Amino acid sequence: MSSFGTLFKVTTYGESHCKSVGCIVEGCPPGMNLTESDVQVQLTRRRPGQSNLTTPRNEKDKVQIQSGTEFGVTLGTPIGMLVLNQDQKPHDYSDMDNYPRPSHADYTYLEKYGVKASSGGGRSSARETIGRVAAGAIAEKYLLEAYGVEIVAFVSSVGKIAIPLHETASSAILDPEDDTFESPITAEYLKFLNKITREEVDKTTVRCPHAATAAKMAERITRARDNHDSIGGTVTCVIRNVPTGLGEPCFDKLEAKLAHAMMSIPATKSFEIGSGREGCKVAGSKHNDLFYRNADTGKLGTLTNNSGGVQGGISNGENVYFTIGFKSPATIGVEQSTSRYDGSDGVLAAKGRHDPCVVPRAIPIVEAMAALVVMDAVMIQQSRIASRNLLPNAQ
């Protein structure tokens, strides 16, 4: 389906080479200041052609708010936004029209719908994510103003190159006779997640906040591009100042909704929250997040955060953080011996303009989907609280 969310609902539309792409946002609270410039910031971070590490497709991606606001204020009615496609080159795909691109969605879309877009990948193109980013910018603005929620994503690895702070401690066994490991999430890493900013992330073209590692990542992406190949990587995201109580057990737990959102992004292959897979190697005595009373807030907090800010599917007030794995882009210029749609053998060397690595441009998409999840969860929880407060003898 092309819609996401329950109370804060987003529907995206458009294909890679159609006239426009965009979205309709339902459920935005009325009375919030909102202009196109509020949305444009994130769309500009997502747009192609920002560096030689991304596709050279030249799109301005200027957003137009079509409805739902008046005099720069939200009305509480559906907000329609569109972005014009202006640099399509369908002829780049003419030679590929006889082939389903290996590991791309060409074949599966044809099998599902009985017809496929002849150029650009149609709905499976990353152009579809423009609507997500636009909607996410609205959600993020509300969350920041109402709750102080901050969302920052960054590239944590490209291929085998990872930032040092993202390396885990699980490679060192504590005792030769003990087969358990230390917690993979160090205090240093948690401090890093607590202070990292988008300005620091955007200082490098790769969007990795560790300069030395970013340079190596850039070299790796450049090598893939020069070889007409591609490479994958990971994006880590932290959500700060998350209210407690978000998430709907049992099937709409907060981490389940985040996983749903992140795995709906094109090219994603994995999702890990908190200590992730590495936490499976740790004994409970080393992995449990012990509670303490926060002197500033008077509330309980945790000394560590292996849970990633979620326990029992509900936010506990700590930072929510997770890592998403993105595969290498499927459309590459390397010659591949594969079959045509008619079953005959051939050699495909893809043409067109494509990202050699998607993770640098995936940053605002990940942030947007995180904002949509938290926004929807906040509205659901607030409706529960409001209903409860109407009871005269609520306990």
Swiss-Prot record:
Pfam families: Chorismate_synt. Its cofactor is FMNH2. NCBIfam families: aroC (TIGR00033), PRK05382.1 (NF003793). Pathway: Metabolic intermediate biosynthesis; chorismate biosynthesis; chorismate from D-erythrose 4-phosphate and phosphoenolpyruvate: step 7/7. The keyword Chloroplast does not apply. It is an enzyme of class 4 (lyase). Its EC number is 4.2.3.5. This is Chorismate synthase. GO terms for molecular function: chorismate synthase activity; FMN binding. One of its GO terms (cellular component) is nucleus. It catalyses: 5-O-(1-carboxyvinyl)-3-phosphoshikimate = chorismate + phosphate. GO terms for biological process: amino acid biosynthetic process; aromatic amino acid family biosynthetic process; chorismate biosynthetic process. Keywords: Amino-acid biosynthesis, Aromatic amino acid biosynthesis, Lyase. It comes from Schizosaccharomyces pombe (strain 972 / ATCC 24843).
